[in-house]
């Protein structure tokens, strides 16, 4: 249903359902197409994901492991790359039911959230993953030769990338809490001691490796994100 967004337009329940059906269809189609493209270029994606572990031998420990892992990576990659388009379809569906004031609040939040999510993935790929792999490879390298399972390696990488992307949503959560007047920037600042402890715990939970280097870097990143959220709320006078 192609139409211009009108905040004063009232739709019947059947029109809402038809609109929802079309948005879901478009979002699903985009996801399927992008996932298929990712699977077609799986060698290129695998090469990119293997870069932090140059020099490591990867083994296929079970029949079909590479195939099943390739499908998993293609699904994750498809979801990642199609997520902005899916969110756009969701936005088009909910905007007509919002007031102008609500739309001016939600749209920037969604846009910044996408940017932060991808920033978290880039941060993990450039900083966290190399730091974690370097520690794990060097630890005991004189005793054992690092030969890794292809599937387990990609599970490790994908979990770290996506968990970091989610962790980068902290400023968004803070801004929402501030705008809704649940917590003010002053109250968030007053709890900084608990946040230091919480950042350490969160870093330990979301990082798949147990090495201290990765957890320290992640803790610092979480604290920096939390501080940026407070600064943003200060600017907004919340």
Curated annotation (Swiss-Prot):
Subcellular location: Plastid, Chloroplast membrane
Keyword Transmembrane carried by entry: yes
Gene Ontology CC annotations of this record: chloroplast membrane; TAT protein transport complex
Keywords linked to the UniProt accession: Chloroplast, Membrane, Plastid, Transmembrane, Transmembrane helix
Keyword set includes Transmembrane helix: yes
Top-rank lineage group of the source organism: Eukaryota
Database matches in InterPro entries: Sec-indep_translocase_CS, TatC
Residues annotated as signal peptide: none
One protein family per Pfam: TatC
Ranges annotated as spanning the membrane: 24-44, 78-98, 109-129, 156-176, 188-208, 216-236
Membrane topology, as annotated: Multi-pass membrane protein
GO biological process: intracellular protein transmembrane transport; protein transport by the Tat complex
Family that this chain belongs to: Belongs to the TatC family.
Protein name: Uncharacterized tatC-like protein ycf43
């Amino acid at each position: 249903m192609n139409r211009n967004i009108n905040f004063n337009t009232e739709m019947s329940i059947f029109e809402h359902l038809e609109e929802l059906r079309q948005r879901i269809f478009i979002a699903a189609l985009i996801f399927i197409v992008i996932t298929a493209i990712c699977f077609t270029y799986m060698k290129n994606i695998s090469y990119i994901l293997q870069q932090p572990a140059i020099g490591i031998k990867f083994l296929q420990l079970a029949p079909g492991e590479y195939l099943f892992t390739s499908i998993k990576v293609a699904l994750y990659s498809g979801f990642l790359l199609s997520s902005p388009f899916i969110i756009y379809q969701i936005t088009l569906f909910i905007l007509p039911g919002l007031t102008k004031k609500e739309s001016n609040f939600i749209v920037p939040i969604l846009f910044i959230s996408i940017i932060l999510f991808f920033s978290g993935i880039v941060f993990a790929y450039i900083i966290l993953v190399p730091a974690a792999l370097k520690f794990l490879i060097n630890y005991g390298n004189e005793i054992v030769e690092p030969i890794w399972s292809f599937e387990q390696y990609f599970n490790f990488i994908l979990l770290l990338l996506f968990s970091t992307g989610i962790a980068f949503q902290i400023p968004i959560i803070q801004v929402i809490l501030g705008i809704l007047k649940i917590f003010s920037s002053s109250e968030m600042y007053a709890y900084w001691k608990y946040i230091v402890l919480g950042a350490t715990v969160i870093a330990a939970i979301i990082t798949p490796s147990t090495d201290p280097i990765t957890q320290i870097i992640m803790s610092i990143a979480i604290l920096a994100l939390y501080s940026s959220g407070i600064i943003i709320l200060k600017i907004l006078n919340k």
